[in-house]
């Protein structure tokens, strides 16, 4: 809380005129509300405990702090003693915080004094000096030494000696900057919030607000937030990478399956063209050799000369399967031999094997899907077996093909 807010009025000015009429300073209600809320003094002014005695969390912290400051085992301070003295002497939280400031000064300036005094005497004398400093003579909160001695169970002479030794150890320097009071208040609030949160197992919103105001907690929370952000970024990168990898794997697998299922592109269907080009080599009977050659040439004339010149080198020669040997039969007269005036025994070009087929063979148009070449008979005459076409007819076929399809 800003200190200037406590010393200024609503208009931002503080005047000494009529100061006696003010019961409290401007901003005192805010400070009282802060102490009640953060130091567990309660909210109800009528039923709950007032600010004239210490709350239970503040009493616990006071006992712990004074036991560490004065480690003497004689008259070791207990919480019951703190509660009794604070209730009988009406110790306010401001007086308690001022007493903590004095004890902190003694730890740095005169630590030998703390080694010889008991923690109970240190608590009693520090609270008495702080109350006398805050509440001057004539105030309602004024408490005399005999009343302090009765509250603490100490004789007045002993209490006076303790007061003189305490003031000597302090070198009579009791003035305190209000900023030191607010520093002690902030430290006390954080200790109370942390202690109560650990005791309950959970923290209230007020405790969290108090802890987040501390620089140590702010650094710890900032470091935690940075680590969480880094972890979130790493998890996000890992998630995106895994998703991208999964998508890429699915795409690759889909593409590979598509390529394997699709037929591979090949050369165009040349079966019909190759069949028409190589049809002259189909075996035929000797008497009909030239007739088959002429019919094949008439079927191939319909194709363009360009396609014939391009597809002829690409078409592999067909090799018909070998047939079983036929029994030798007497030779018949070959029309080709009669045309060239040759005798059948002397015609070696047509009758190389000296045998002809006597069994009927399958008609060509049934295998090729063509119409029968003979108009007078639906069934073709029997063909010769493979390798029965004469060399002369093959040569004339090549000559006719070169004339029809040049190049």
Curated annotation (Swiss-Prot):
Gene Ontology CC annotation, any one: membrane
Pfam families from the UniProt entry = Cyclin
**InterPro entries named among the record's database cross-references:** Cyclin_PHO80-like
Question: Which membrane topology describes this protein?
Answer: Single-pass membrane protein
Task: Provide this UniProt record's keywords sorted from A to Z.
Answer: Membrane, Transmembrane, Transmembrane helix
Q: Where are the disulfide bridges?
A: none
For whether the record's keyword set contains Transmembrane, the answer is yes
Where does the sequence pass through the membrane? 233-253
UniProt cross-references to Gene3D superfamilies, sorted A to Z:
Cyclin-like
Q: Which family does it belong to?
A: Belongs to the CNPPD1 family.
What is the official name of this protein in its record?
Protein CNPPD1
Q: Which organism is it from?
A: Mus musculus
| Encoding gene per record | Cnppd1
């Amino acid at each position: 809380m800003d200190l200037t807010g406590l010393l200024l009025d609503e208009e931002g000015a503080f005047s000494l005129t009529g100061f006696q009429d003010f019961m409290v300073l401007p901003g005192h209600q805010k400070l009282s509300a802060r102490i009640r809320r953060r130091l567990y003094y309660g909210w109800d002014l009528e039923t709950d405990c007032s600010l004239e005695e210490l709350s239970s969390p503040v009493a616990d912290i006071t006992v712990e702090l004074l036991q560490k400051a004065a480690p003497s085992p004689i008259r070791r301070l207990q919480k019951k003693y703190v509660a009794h003295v604070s209730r009988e002497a009406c110790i306010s939280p401001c007086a308690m915080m001022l007493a903590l400031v004095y004890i902190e000064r003694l730890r740095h300036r005169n630590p030998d004094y703390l080694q010889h005094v008991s923690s109970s005497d240190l608590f009693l004398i520090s609270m008495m000096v702080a109350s006398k400093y805050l509440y001057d003579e004539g105030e309602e909160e004024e408490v005399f030494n005999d009343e302090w001695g009765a509250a603490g169970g100490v004789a007045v002479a002993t209490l006076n000696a303790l007061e003189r030794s305490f003031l000597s150890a302090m070198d009579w320097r009791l003035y305190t900057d209000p900023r030191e009071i607010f520093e002690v208040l902030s430290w006390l609030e954080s200790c109370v919030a942390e202690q109560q949160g650990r005791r309950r197992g959970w923290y209230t919103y007020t405790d969290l607000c108090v802890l987040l105001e501390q620089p140590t907690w702010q650094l710890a929370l900032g470091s935690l937030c940075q680590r969480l952000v880094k972890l979130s970024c790493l998890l996000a990168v890992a998630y995106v990478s895994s998703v991208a990898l999964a998508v890429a794997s699915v795409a690759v697998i889909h593409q590979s399956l598509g390529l394997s299922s699709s037929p591979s592109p090949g050369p165009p269907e040349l079966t019909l063209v190759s069949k028409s080009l190589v049809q002259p080599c189909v075996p035929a009977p000797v008497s009909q050799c030239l007739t088959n050659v002429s019919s094949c040439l008439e079927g191939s004339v319909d194709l363009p000369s360009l396609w014939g010149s391009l597809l002829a080198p690409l078409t592999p020669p067909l090799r018909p399967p070998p047939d079983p040997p036929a029994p030798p039969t007497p030779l018949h007269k070959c029309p080709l031999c009669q045309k060239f005036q040759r005798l059948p025994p002397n015609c070696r070009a047509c009758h190389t094997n000296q045998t002809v087929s006597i069994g009927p063979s399958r008609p060509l148009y049934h295998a090729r899907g063509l119409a029968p070449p003979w108009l007078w008979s639906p069934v073709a005459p029997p063909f010769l077996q493979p390798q029965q076409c004469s060399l002369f007819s093959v040569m004339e076929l090549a000559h006719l093909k070169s004339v029809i399809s040049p190049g």
